[in-house]
Amino acid sequence: FATIGNKKSAGTKLVCLDSFFNNPGVYEIDMGTPMKKIFNEIGGGYKEPVKAFQVGGPLGGVVPLSEIDNLNLDFQEFTAKGFMLGHASVVSIPKDFSMSEYIHHLFEFSAEESCGKCFPGRLGSYRGKEMFDQAKKGTAKIPLKLLNELLVTMQKGCLCALCGAIPTPIMNILKYFGDEMKNDMMKDN
């Protein structure tokens, strides 16, 4: 098993490709395989245009399409680039899907699933969802500085992996899709 894959991440990994791929399914793939090969050759490309992928479930990183050519199926490589490989399921985000809506969904998920034991998880998830609720309704813009402080507090202060890791995909979206979301954001002084 250790001879399969690469030195950093040995063995194989089950990778689940969603229905946006021409060849959706679960594949056992050698660690170290280029993501480009997994998506284009094994997955057969995409049925419709996509702009990003959430890899590794709701706590996994959101990887823009432009970064796929630069990644291999490797835990350390994903982490070094600010993503998380996790269990390697791949959820495609369509080109026309709002990233503000996607972040709202992530906060909604963590607010619903939080155990409620710690303040950063219980209140942070709810406050994040509330910020995006108001932006959706058009009643308020999201204060970017406050959002970033909330995400750092959740990363550092949450007791469980759920609420402590949910900032990773949100930070990925803010980094790679910030321009798309500028109408929902309020720059702080």
Residue ranges and their predicted role:
Residues 1-189:
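Redox cofactor-anchoring modules in respiratory/redox and cofactor-processing assemblies
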